[in-house]
Amino acid sequence: MKFPKRNIDISEYLSEIKALLGDNDCAIFIDTNIISQLYRLNDAARQDFYNWVKSCGDRFHIPVWVIHEYSNKIHHNKTTDYLSELSKIKQYSNDFSNISDFVKGYVGESLLVGSIYQGKVQDLKDEIDAIEDSLKKISTAISKNIAKHQSTVHEEIVKQLEERILDTDIFSIVGNADNIFCQRSNNRIPPGYKDNAKEENRVGDYIIWREILQYCRENNVRKAILITRDMKTDITYFPDNQTVEGYRPAGNTETIRVAKIALYMSSILIPKVTNSKSLISKLLLKFSHHNTKTWHYLSN
């Protein structure tokens, strides 16, 4: 175990990550929240992602536990959770409709003196009606085909990514995971200890971590990257200074390094795909497996 390290060379670290992403000996894994992100991307951006996955060849993998977590969303019809912002469109439309009649009845010449609507009370009322009508049209247009669209996205995911799923014997990991996780979480050993209070799937992050370690060990993989959007402090933390980074000690054979930096998909995460900034910057985790286990986290 080492003392925490407060500073690293950001440029050097980014170069290291970029090199690993293009390294044919580096395995790449994704977290469940990357699959959920696909529901939040437009058609072109999703295709960019699928093209990048193809460019990775047989280096790209999806842990079995990721599929387990995603399947729960599908089976319980909760993929709308991935698009919580869309529900606000209807909410805002209804809210505006509820207040529009009051506003139109309340405004008068004296209230509008000195404004762009001075002497134009009816113009203001007409614009309020136009806004209300536009919000209703937008809400209807987006909600009309949302269920069908989500089914389409799921079908895409299955077609493009199913062959990337690992064949892990997940029960060999789950069997003792809870007991080990309790010991680790009680001592704040990352990853995943922040989920200790969750009622369900509190061991999920730890199981995914174990699954990746097992794959790397069994296949003699010495370098790997996990792409995730998890921002909890049991995976990464946010120092006051943008350039301050550190090591999170996790045991004699485990070390976690945190790097807080904005990372654009087009230049780092998907170097071979153009027009991919729409995929948003992601949290990257680099795992180098030598004689010890070292985990490196890179966040935006």
Q: Where are these predicted regions, by residue range?
A:
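Active-site-proximal, substrate-binding regions of enzyme catalytic domains
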Residues: 2-224, 232-300
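Cofactor-binding loop segments of dinucleotide-utilizing enzymes, especially the Rossmann-like FAD-
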Residues: 229
